[in-house]
Amino acid sequence: MSPATRRNFLRGSLAAAAATAAPAQTAAPDQSIVKPAAALPMRVSVMAYSFHGLLEQGRMDIFGFLETCKYRYHLETADLWNGFLKSTDEAYLKTIRNEIDERELIVPNLAVDQAHVWADDPVQREKQHQNALAHLNAGRILGARFVRMDAGQCGKNTREWTSEAFDHIVKRYREYAQYAYDHGFKTGAEVHWGPESYWPSMQKLSRAVNHPGFGVCCHISGFQGTKEEVDIADREIAPWVVHTHIDWDVCNGQLVEKLNNLRSAGYQGYYSVEHHSAKDEYAEVAIQLAKVRAVLQSWRTGGTGVDSNHEERS
């Protein structure tokens, strides 16, 4: 090909390319590449306690948990438990926060044990209070949206608090809630143990605290009582719920009904699974996550949440 012919060929090729590209500069965006709502991230998470067996065996630490959430389960969340935290030292917590941010993870919850508000022994009560303050600060550093701290119980009474204990619990939760509110998150109790798991007591507590920085983590179907009483409690607590823990039995039972309670109340938090057996944790958690995801995906595509091939078990 002569130089003149080559120049003419190149001019023709460039003109054709420009003509092809020109419409793309003025045409409306191709809506086919916009991510549809059904493909957006689901509000799903897994509670770190689900891997306490691996933790105790030295086979997982906090950083391994973050990797597991992001890359094994393809989550955008990490539901933390202070059993995985070696300390509340700020430098250590900031290292964890850096790893959270590196993976672009959201922390919907930090569950804190050994910081329950009431203990009959005043010395122990103060020790737990200081631990609560340290973990509220941890929640702030880690970017948690909710920090769960239990209320505690009086002696062996699992249904009601004494007047002294109740007044103290309400006072402390209001203090904690104000700190949380000032720093952009919430804190509160969980349907977990003691009077927290007795609906009349938990309802009384939620109404008494009455603070915008206070909320409740609902360990679904964790209430005391008959099945009918538990079902009623799960429905009635929904307006106060800001986080959830969904165990194996719920995932394999009334999952759709229980999640519908929250959906009907306008729940905006995350649906977090929790596993307890300390055995085959990777596989068991995957099963629970799949069941919760299936319900949410059904809702997002106009379904009822119930797989037509597998009716929900009561």
Language-model features: locations:
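Positions that flank functional sites
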Residues: 84-85, 115, 154, 195, ...
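Metal-dependent catalytic neighborhoods of phosphoester/phosphodiester hydrolases
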Residues: 88-94, 121-125, 282-285
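Catalytic-core regions built around general acid/base machinery
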Residues: 92-102, 172-179, 233-236, 258-262
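Short catalytic-loop micro-motif centered on adjacent basic/acidic residues
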Residues: 78-80, 187-191, 218, 244-246
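Histidine-acidic metal/acid-base catalytic patches
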Residues: 2-74, 196-314
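Glycine-rich, proline-tolerant flexible connector loops at the mouths of alpha/beta enzymes
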Residues: 79-97, 154-157
